[in-house]
Regions:
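N-terminal secretory signal peptides that target proteins for export/translocation
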Residues: 1-2
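Bacterial N-terminal signal peptides
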Residues: 5-15
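N-terminal leader/targeting segments
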Residues: 19-78, 96
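Ser/Thr-rich, low-complexity intrinsically disordered terminal regions
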Residues: 52, 57, 113-131
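Long, charged/polar, surface-exposed segments that mediate recognition or autoinhibition
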Residues: 64-123
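A mature extracytoplasmic/lumenal domain signature
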Residues: 86, 118-119, 130, 139-141
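Short, exposed beta-strand-loop hairpins at the edges of beta-sheets
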Residues: 126-128, 134-146
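Short, low-complexity, Pro/Ser/Thr/Gly-rich segments in the mature regions of secreted, periplasmic
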Residues: 143-158
C-alpha cells in the first residue's frame, strides 16, 4: 500500500514538474563542472586534483572536461581553459561568445560581474566579488582557420 501511495504521488507530480522545467530553460550541461572548476581554483591545491598528463610547455591535460567543450587543459598551477566547438566565421564565434556569456553568468549566479574596462568586443572578463577568480571568454582562430570561443578560469593575483 505504501508503494502504491508513493507511485500515485510521483505520477501526480509529473505535470507540475514538466511545467516547471519548461518554464525555466535548462542549465547548460557544463554548469556543475564549471562551478567545480571555480571552487577548485581557490583551494590550496588549485587544480592539482584534476591535472592529467603533461603537454608541451607548461600545459597539462585535465581530468575534468566541461560537457560540450573541447581541448580542455591546465596552464601552470592556476589556469584552466577550454575551447568551444569550431565555427566557420568570426561572426559566428562572436555570437556564440555572447550566448556563452549569458550561459556562464546564469551558471555561476550572483557575485559575478563583467569588468567593462578589461573587456573588448571580442573579449569579456568576469570577476567574482568575493573570491580572487576571473573568467574570460574570448574568440580565437585555430591553425586550420576555424573560429572558437575560449573559456579561461584563472586565479587573480591582486
Amino acid at each position: 500500500m505504501k508503494r502504491l501511495a508513493m507511485l500515485f504521488l510521483a505520477l501526480a507530480s509529473l505535470p507540475a514538474t514538466a511545467l516547471a522545467q519548461s518554464a525555466h530553460p535548462q542549465a547548460p550541461p557544463y554548469c556543475f563542472d564549471l562551478s567545480r572548476v571555480v571552487d577548485l581554483a581557490v583551494t590550496k591545491e588549485r587544480f592539482a586534483s584534476i591535472a592529467g598528463r603533461p603537454r608541451p610547455g607548461d600545459f597539462r591535460d585535465t581530468k575534468l572536461v566541461l560537457a560540450g567543450w573541447k581541448d580542455c587543459s591546465l596552464y601552470g598551477a592556476a589556469t584552466y581553459t577550454c575551447d568551444s566547438a569550431e565555427m566557420d566565421t568570426a561572426e559566428q564565434a562572436d555570437e556564440a561568445r555572447r550566448d556563452l556569456l549569458d550561459d556562464v553568468k546564469s551558471c555561476l549566479g550572483a557575485g559575478w560581474a563583467e569588468v567593462a574596462e578589461r573587456s573588448s568586443p571580442s573579449y569579456v572578463v568576469l570577476q567574482n566579488a568575493a573570491r580572487p577568480v576571473s573568467i574570460t571568454l574570448s574568440t580565437d582562430q585555430t591553425d586550420s582557420k576555424r573560429h572558437v570561443v575560449r573559456l579561461t578560469v584563472f586565479v587573480r593575483r591582486n
